[in-house]
Amino acid sequence: MSELLSCFEIEPTVTPQLGSVIWMHGLGATSQDFVPVVPYLHLPEVRFIFPQAPESPVALNGGMIMPSWYDIRTLSESPNRESEEDIRKTALSIEALIEREKQRGVPANKIIIAGFSQGGAIAMHVAL
């Protein structure tokens, strides 16, 4: 299993727990960006997990080090516009969080992966 990412978690406030949401932020953001949205969802029986992307250089941004799920090299149509290695590594990290939720007793069909921007791309990649 891949090493678990650092996460901000909001535990369910009622029992039984009915599911979990693993919600990834966008490029340059933090794990807590979408935490303020949770109360508006009215899902007290759900655990929310907000993983933090590792900090790494992003070529598109002049090599600036920032929270990033994967390197973006260019916006042009190119077979190497993103780092496939970074995407695979991140996918394994998210899959490890999914496995942890299953070990916590959450059925796989009650685990939702979501994300915004770069985090949304990773959510889609993992889901496929």
Please give the residue ranges for each predicted region.
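Serine-hydrolase catalytic machinery in alpha/beta-hydrolase-like enzymes
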Residues: S2-A108
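Active-site signature of alpha/beta-hydrolase-fold catalytic machinery across serine-
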Residues: P36, H125-V126
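Short helix-capping and hinge/turn segments at secondary-structure transitions, especially at repeat
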Residues: E99, Q103, G119, A127-L128
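Residue in the alpha/beta-hydrolase core beta-strand immediately N-terminal to the catalytic nucleophile
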Residues: K110-I112
